[in-house]
Each structure stands twice: as structure tokens, then as C-alpha cells.
Amino acid sequence: MAIRLEKGQRINLEKNNGSKLTQFCVGCNWGAVIEKKYKEVVISEGFLGFGRKTENKQYDHVIDVDLDLSCLLFDVEGRPIDHIYSPLYRFGDNKVGLPNGKLDTLDRALHHTGDDLTGDQSGDDGLDNEIITVDLVRINPNVNSIVFFLNIYNNDDYQGDFSSIPYAYIRMYEGTPTKVKEVFAQYDVATKTECVGMRGLILGKLYRRNGEWKFNAIGDAFADKSIVHTIARVIKDYSH
């Protein structure tokens, strides 16, 4: 049975059979926002324009929601040594002092499956929209911690917060990006009251202790309008 993570909870990466979880996916699944709207439709034209009848019919207006799942990797001193976030973030062009986004860590131990710009359009399909695959066996020995975080991309389509999204959850599971074998742990974002009004979320941290990897579900939410602010926050407050 999957662990339902709560804010501040720490867990060992140990499966039910006692073996360690070393190769897994960290995925985020969410739905587009559905608004009920009405439009006037003609039900009878009448005769020569007289007696024309109309009525308001309800329809679903789908609003794309672009969430971005990212992570930063730190050494034992808390210095950032690698990163994964959407290649659509071209910080080098904006001169904000951050590297451009990429989908793989330098050691290829972590891989992002790509940026989903919309969310599920027709309800929960059971698959994650954005996924970072993790292989702790291959990871650079200098990596001491990995902080995962989530942002709502700031565009004209959706200006709301996490609480307005019909469902959004993060999970760690064994399997592949297209097939979930067994869910190890899950954190439900959209159900958290602390996410009301918030657009950035520090999800959790993988970290080494005495040669073993553990996970801390952080769950700190912020009103960050840009991933730039969240990255700066992670480096300053969550790298140790």
C-alpha cells in the first residue's frame, strides 16, 4: 500500500519486501481546469425574424494548466551541482544568472520526460503528466541531496493557484513513465489548504544519511510568480 505523505514526514526508501528502492519515477499528475459557461443558441428562427426563440446552453470551457516539475542537486556543502527543469526556460537569454533548462543530469541518473503544457483534458487517465526518472545506483557520488519542486507556469491561460486545479498529486513509484508497477508514496497537492493562493511548492528532498538514501516530504508552498524565485528559495533554504 502506498504511503500517503504528510508535510514534514520522513521515510526510508524501503519496499515491503525489505529491499531498497533505487530505481523509480517521481511523477506529477494534474487536470486542466473545467469552467461551466453558457452560450445563447437558437432553437427556432420563427417566421421572417419574428418569433425567434433562443436559450442558454451550458458547456465546458477547458483552461490549460501548465505545471512544471523540476529538481536541483546539491553536494554535501549545499552547493548546487546539477539541475533539471524545462528546456523552455532559457535563462541565459534573460540574464538572470541561472543555467538554461535541460532534461537530463550530467551523469544521466535522472531524466525528465518533457514539459506538459495543458494537464489532463478529459479527466484523470491514471498516468503522470510530467515525470523524472531516478536511478540512485548511477548517481554522481558527489550528490548529497536532490530537492524536487513544482511551479505553475506564469502564462495567460491560467492565473489561478494550486487549489483551483481539480486534482494534482505527486508520487514515487516503481515502473516506467508509461506503466505504473507499484506506487511507493504519494502527496496530494490540490487537497492541501496551505496551497490556497500558492503557485510554487517545495515537494521534498532525497538525501543521503550514513550511505543510505531517505526522503523528506517538505510540502512548503509559496506565492512565487516565477520559477526563478523558487530556484533561489531552494538554493538558499533547502540545500542543506
Annotate each PLM feature.
Residues 1-145, 149-240:
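Intrinsic-disorder/low-complexity signal
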